């Protein structure tokens, strides 16, 4: 082993020691294993990342006495072992919560050995770069760097390639196919021909994987800063169509003579554009960038954020186009109403993937509303009432819609002879946001001009849903700045009542 690798192994050893010292949960696990003379191995991703000089918060241990160890640690520390994988018997050690205490910095999982030894276990893992183990029991005795690497994972990390541990690695668990592309992107690896061959041979088995596991891996991919490049690789190798069959009709669907990209490639380009804007969000939104980032970071389900669902919406925003394509008398191609059909298709896809109701509604609404900023952009100057109605959607929708619009615009510009001039886009979005913050947002604090009692008395109504309908209409007019006084509000209510009756 060369000097560079020895230096890296020294760093790995230091990382392991810092890990043990920096976590009460882990130090207790190590001490309990030592006292009971149980074997204990640190495995997988933490070691891979430590070798590369990266941090990792997910820590995995294995032991032939995993169940006994978990119980002993729980007794000593008050941690709660929670079963998270029934198939492999993996438990997560949840530390007790103490007031004013600093939280556990790591997520700690403990699993039984697969097979009769640590080497059997490592051979059953997915990829060689993950088939690493650090012998904690041996380290306790001499504090040495007891790294086990039976499949050459360190060499593969050095060479930047992703190899499977065995011929059956992917067929045993086809979800590892998606993980392969995610690892390639995250660590800048290459897929050797043999690995790609294994992927193509096993990808038909993806339909045997539980939908929830597919969903989790897909959302992990979308949460990556380079999700577009991962999806392109999956697409080129024919894997993505197995995961998102609803998108097959978007392929090879030409949009117009001026737009060279067909619908599916345009959607992937829009996702790339979104990732560009997320990386350069201040350039697009200026002083408003922090507010947008706060909204996008909100969690919709578990650890899945609004931003991750926005990426899915960008990928699906034109999913309705194959069903609304028409050709005018002059030969122009139209997709009238594709956002309505697309919203329904996007909702069905989200339901199939078992996304939460919040995620499903969010993605569906973004697809349904994605043409609104486009229509506003085409009007010069932008009508204030139309702009007010757009912002009436609320920050949880208008921020993602602005980013979806910007991404759609950038992808369109780059696919035409117009080029990639984004200055008009930046200026219009800044103007819209100035209008919102200077004129609309202050109105959010204004109380209603009239009450339901006022309407009942003035219009001689009895309490009914009509009163609520009138109040909602007046609130929208007040938001738009169309009514400012009590007299104006009551007169408008009378006109609306006459109109509706």
Where are the predicted features?
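Catalytic cores of the polymerase beta-like nucleotidyltransferase superfamily
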Residues: 1-501
